[in-house]
Amino acid sequence: FVELAYTFLEDELYYRIDNKPMLVLWNAHQLYSKDSKKLYDNIRQRVKEATGLDLYLVARQPNWSPAARFHNFFMTGGVDAVYMDNMFNQMDWARSYMYPQYINENYKYNRQYTLTNYNIDFIPAISTSYNAWMWNGTDRYNVPIQMHDEGLFHDMCNVAKINLGQHPMVIIDAFN
């Protein structure tokens, strides 16, 4: 990990927040520790010793989940920000009819909760579209397809703007 940090984080083109390189912890909810604060402090310390740089740590939270669920993981661990995984990847057809409204309410709750209870910033993430069937059309049949739609993307951009955290940033999740 430290070698990777040394290789990438010192690059002047690497994304930074408050002059700190941003590091996204992809499955932070599965990073188990008896003392999450100590774990994250050790990550920061080891990278600082190797590179001389302070980190801006971002934890990726699973979609459609409440922030309080991760109290013993990254919330008390001291990450700087949280963002939620692709909100289109879910198995509820009812939600798909009003994605912008439902996602806005989810983001609003999580943004306020993380800031009020943990002083952790929130980064909204939006997606341009989503098609789970591209992997296998037989076992993902119950996941709604979200086709490329300029109007929906515009609405999702507005949802992101409404829910910006202390650092105005949006992650565009367009993996498929």
Where are these regions (language model features)?
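Glycan-processing catalytic domains of CAZymes
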Residues: 1-176
